[in-house]
UniProtKB/Swiss-Prot annotation:
The lineage of its organism: Eukaryota, Metazoa, Chordata, Craniata, Vertebrata. GO terms for biological process: antimicrobial humoral immune response mediated by antimicrobial peptide; CCL21-activated CCR7 signaling pathway; cell chemotaxis; cell maturation; cell-cell signaling; cellular response to chemokine; cellular response to prostaglandin E stimulus; chemokine (C-C motif) ligand 21 signaling pathway. It holds the Pfam family IL8. GO terms for molecular function: CCR chemokine receptor binding; CCR7 chemokine receptor binding; chemokine activity; chemokine receptor binding. It comes from Homo sapiens (Human). Residues 112-122 have a biased composition (Basic residues). This is C-C motif chemokine 21.
Length: 134
């Protein structure tokens, strides 16, 4: 009885304790298989990432992430001059910051600070007032 329990425990340890090499990254990696034939305009791209053959992909590539998240990544040859220039442009350009609450500028708000028609329920920030002398 004790031997069968020890054997079962050993099998469990071996089954779950040995790291797996195939697919150990959590899933299949998306790889570019060919490069875009057209130059990609900077206005349609928000960022990029690098694809390396050493990480399991067949070709080196730069994957440009489009501004519209519903669109597919755009693959480009890292040796092309326009690709290097676009990467430098994206490195210099700070990523756009969204407003803290996603609010639009209040339209129709009165001077008292009440919400207007276009405020969409967003809070206005109060200006800190310095106390006046005693």
């Amino acid at each position: 009885m004790a031997q069968s329990l020890a054997l079962s425990l050993l099998i469990l340890v071996l089954a779950f304790g040995i790291p797996r090499t195939q697919g150990s990254d959590g899933g299949a990696q998306d790889c570019c298989l060919k490069y875009s034939q057209r130059k990609i305009p900077a206005k349609v791209v928000r960022s990029y990432r690098k694809q390396e053959p050493s990480l399991g992909c067949s070709i080196p590539a730069i994957l440009f992430l489009p501004r519209k998240r519903s669109q597919a990544e755009l693959c480009a040859d890292p040796k092309e001059l326009w690709v290097q220039q676009l990467m430098q442009h994206l490195d210099k350009t700070p990523s756009p910051q969204k407003p803290a609450q996603g609010c639009r500028k209040d339209r129709g708000a009165s001077k008292t600070g009440k919400k207007g028609k276009g405020s969409k329920g967003c809070k206005r920030t109060e200006r800190s007032q310095t106390p006046k002398g005693p």
